[in-house]
Amino acid sequence: MKKLFLKLMKRNLSEDKIRKLGVQVGNDCRFLSVDRSTFGSEPYLIQIGNHVTITSGVKFATHDGGVWIFRKKYPEIDNFHRIFIGNNVFIGINSIILPGVTIGNNVVVGAGSVVTKDVPDNVIIGGNPAKKIKSIEAYETKILENADYTKKLNYNEKKIYLLNKFKENRYN
């Protein structure tokens, strides 16, 4: 099972390939299960800061596809905008970042969020449309209440630790 998991995790586009698409990428970034479609049709309009994690299913839209309904009247119409992601940002699974958005520094974007407007520094956002849920300080306090320190454990040690912590079995 571990080998399958690791194999699936390697299906990512490498940071090098992401840069070759034209995305401007800072240092110490992680791209988890991202592919070419993550960055849309104008990846060169996306700038990502340092220490940013982009998770699977995230989509960046740098254009307004809705202009299609005006194409008969304006055959050449398009509407493009840049997207900026600050430093120390985590973008959760299946989130969508829409054209013209700037996400500040020290931000967590909750899974499934649709980010339609600029996000200030030091907040947790989520929802559709994404809204502030709490400050980064309040989030840190909550996380520390139930934190697990497993980064130095190997796979089996972590498995044993977590199964012991969560012994409840609701189906037997």
UniProtKB/Swiss-Prot annotation:
Metabolic or biological pathway, per its Swiss-Prot or TrEMBL entry: Capsule biogenesis; capsule polysaccharide biosynthesis
UniProt entry keywords in alphabetical sequence: Capsule biogenesis/degradation, Exopolysaccharide synthesis, Repeat, Transferase
Alphabetical GO biological process terms: capsule polysaccharide biosynthetic process
Domain of life assignment: Bacteria
Gene3D superfamilies reported in the protein's UniProt record: Hexapeptide repeat proteins
Family label: Belongs to the transferase hexapeptide repeat family.
Name of the protein this chain belongs to: Protein CapG
Originating organism: Staphylococcus aureus
